[in-house]
Amino acid sequence: MRLRNKPWAQKLVAEHPEVILNEPDPDKKINWEERFEDFSKPLAIEIGSGKGQFITTLAKEHPEMNFIGVELQTTAAGMILRTKLEEKIDNLQLMCADAANIAMYLPENSVDIVYLNFSDPWPKTRHEKRRLTYKSFLDKYRQILKPEGHLEFKTDNRGLFEYSLVSLNNYGMKFDYVSLDLHHADDEIFERNVETEYEHKFAAKGNPIYCLHAHFVK
């Protein structure tokens, strides 16, 4: 869902290039060693961070890791940035960028976890290539993930979940976890689950939350 444009968010993003990259040039290498205090820590990225509840919570809970939130909308990115600055979340960097270029922004084999949370389902067939679990996006995740890295995906959209199961399977990925109702799963994955804004809203209405974890076979 596109948020209404907030001029303050654009201004805030422009004022803090040290912690948020705004539409970076895909052809220009990003020096992540300079942007993080210790880039040798395990790295997780969330593609489509929305207002940032998931990525900011996770970063605060895991100071032993680094996190990158990728969000295309400037207003949403500004909201995440505001939280990061107010709560002094030092192990979080942000990008206001198109996920289609993600493999050009990050070094090969540098990421431990890719999070896809409540992505736009793009239900029309002609928009299939825009889905974040389409094969061309899987190509990019494979490039940036470490050999032992994995992908975690959550959605309330049954159609997108079924599509993603087929897409990942056809790509040759192996599933480590699949749930058709995460919030009623009595397991470790639910116990450590961090909710997004959308997830909290959908789950409160009684909607099932679909979840999968998968890895590439090298």
UniProtKB/Swiss-Prot annotation:
Binding site for substrate: 124, 156, 196-199
Residue runs in coiled coils: none
Gene Ontology cellular component list: tRNA methyltransferase complex
The enzyme's E.C. designation: 2.1.1.33
Active site location: 120
GO molecular function: tRNA (guanine(46)-N7)-methyltransferase activity
Keywords on record: Methyltransferase, S-adenosyl-L-methionine, Transferase, tRNA processing
One Pfam family cited in the UniProt record for this chain: Methyltransf_4
Residues annotated as binding S-adenosyl-L-methionine: 46, 71, 98, 120
CDD domains noted in UniProt: AdoMet_MTases
Pathway annotation: tRNA modification; N(7)-methylguanine-tRNA biosynthesis
Span list, region Interaction with RNA: 126-131
Top-level taxon of the source organism: Bacteria
Reactions catalysed, as given in the entry: guanosine(46) in tRNA + S-adenosyl-L-methionine = N(7)-methylguanosine(46) in tRNA + S-adenosyl-L-homocysteine
Cited function: Catalyzes the formation of N(7)-methylguanine at position 46 (m7G46) in tRNA.
Family named by the database record: Belongs to the class I-like SAM-binding methyltransferase superfamily. TrmB family.
This protein's name: tRNA (guanine-N(7)-)-methyltransferase
GN (gene name): trmB
